[in-house]
Curated annotation (Swiss-Prot):
This is Protein HEAT INTOLERANT 4. A motif (Nuclear localization signal 3) lies at residues 370-377. It is found in: Nucleus; Nucleus, Nucleolus. It comes from the Eukaryota. One of its GO terms (cellular component) is chromocenter. InterPro entries: HIT4. Residues 363-394 form a coiled coil. Essential protein required for basal thermotolerance, especially during heat-induced chromocentre decondensation, thus regulating transcriptional gene silencing (TGS).
Length: 434
């Protein structure tokens, strides 16, 4: 009987353990289904723990074999109670075991937790309606003309430094100059030398007369530079100076049209040269007054050997007698008689009577100097012609001067009534005014 009881107990304990394992597997399978992200490794650990519990139960069943057999009814009740307790313990351990998830442990949020979190979230503010953006129309800039800035590049020789800004007060239109140098124009393909000048004029503008510094551009058609010298002269200066351009930081520079400035160009093959000045305006305040005034008295110099100079023909001299106040006048040695000239000045109280004799000597000195200069100029002209090659002679004889004024436009004063062919005392008059 004892052996049978023991075998019966062992079989019951085995069946109970199998039932417990089945229940644990169902719990694990159910947990796996609800959380698809559970790692496979952790599942195997849970199953191993359950199996270990089953082995412990089998070991306990073997120990029961060694114990004395109990009555069947009591033994069955005790075994049932022990199996139920163990099954509940295994179930509790599985439920208590935290389920591993990828990315770390997290607690499953309950409905209550979700409601609490929703209460803590700030109520989003109502966004203001955005105003519809107005599509801006594209702005088109007028393409610059190839020679548009030529008149600005040509330095306005003889203009006072503080008047340069007034010269560019208006956007002057020099398309007539551009057209003459472009294809189809009278100067197209010809080598030219360009310089600027200014002429203060009283012109009508917006219903009123206004003094305006009118720009003009002089173009010399020549195969070589017309001159490399600058003349410095004025009524206030007693002596006229003819000096090299470079002493005044001026020179003939090749002009590059706007359309060619973005690539390398052979400047030596340029057809347009402008008289440029490299003197920086910022350095003028450190310059002496006499040197500064020289820029204002500069005139582009030109010597035409085949045309008698106006100085050679003139019989007048500029008189600036040093007295208080200075006596400034002109004396013509062919038409004026010196004694009558002096008496008239004394009578008009322009000259003190006690300085009459001194004034006479001063005038005679000026006349002698002027006559000497005329003789020297004639001799120099004859010598230059003798030493000149035939090509140079022909170039001088074919040389032409053109003077350009700005065209009328709505934004600029009308200068059509003040145009003049006169350039300066050295160049004389232009062959054509455009």
């Amino acid at each position: 009987m004892k052996k049978g009881a023991k075998r019966k107990g062992v079989s019951k304990a085995g069946r109970k353990a199998a039932v417990a394992e089945t229940q644990n597997d169902e719990v694990i399978e159910e947990t796996t289904k609800t959380t698809q992200e559970e790692s496979q490794q952790h599942e195997e650990e849970v199953v191993d723990e359950v199996k270990e519990n089953g082995e412990e139960e089998e070991a306990k069943g073997d120990q029961e074999e060694e114990e004395d057999a109990k009555p069947d009814s009591l033994e069955e009740d005790e075994e049932n109670q022990e199996d139920e307790v163990k099954a509940e313990e295994v179930k509790e351990e599985v439920e208590k075991k935290p389920v591993a998830r990828r990315g770390g442990k997290r607690k499953r949020a309950t409905k209550k937790d979700t409601e609490i979190k929703d209460e803590k979230k700030p109520v989003p503010k109502a966004k203001k309606p955005r105003a519809a953006k107005v599509k801006e129309e594209p702005v088109y800039f007028e393409e610059k003309r190839s020679l548009e800035d030529l008149w600005k590049v040509a330095f306005p020789v003889g203009t006072e430094w503080d008047q340069l800004d007034a010269l560019y007060e208006f956007n002057w239109d020099f398309q007539n100059l551009e057209e003459a140098l472009e294809e189809g124009g009278k100067l197209y393909g010809k080598k030219v030398y360009v310089f600027g000048c200014t002429e203060p004029q009283l012109v009508p503008y917006k219903g009123a007369n206004k003094i305006v510094h009118v720009p003009a551009v002089v173009v010399i058609e020549s195969p070589f530079p017309p001159s490399d010298k600058i003349g410095i002269t004025s009524v206030q200066r007693e002596v006229e100076e003819i000096i090299p351009m470079k002493k005044m930081k001026m020179d003939w520079l090749p002009y590059i049209p706007i359309e060619k400035r973005d690539r390398q160009v052979d400047k030596m093959n340029s057809q347009i040269f402008t008289l440029g000045c490299t003197q920086r305006r910022s350095a003028l305040r450190h310059m002496k007054e006499d040197q500064l005034k020289k820029f204002e008295y500069c005139l582009p110099y030109f010597y035409q050997p085949f045309k008698e100079d106006e100085l050679e023909q003139s019989t007048e001299v500029q008189i600036m007698f040093p007295s208080e106040p200075p006596v400034v006048c002109e004396f013509d040695w062919e038409f004026d008689e010196l004694q009558e000239f002096v008496d008239k000045l004394v009578e008009e109280e322009a000259l003190p009577a006690e300085q009459a004799d001194e004034f006479k000597e001063y005038v005679k000195e000026q006349v002698r100097a002027a006559k000497k200069a005329n003789r020297e100029a004639k001799d120099a002209r004859k010598k230059a012609i003798e030493e000149m090659s035939e090509d140079t002679k022909q170039a001088f004889q074919k040389m032409k001067f053109y003077k350009f004024y700005p065209q009328p436009s709505p934004d600029t004063p009308d200068v059509s009534g003040v145009q003049s062919p006169f350039i300066n005392r050295y160049y004389g008059k232009a062959h054509e005014v455009l």
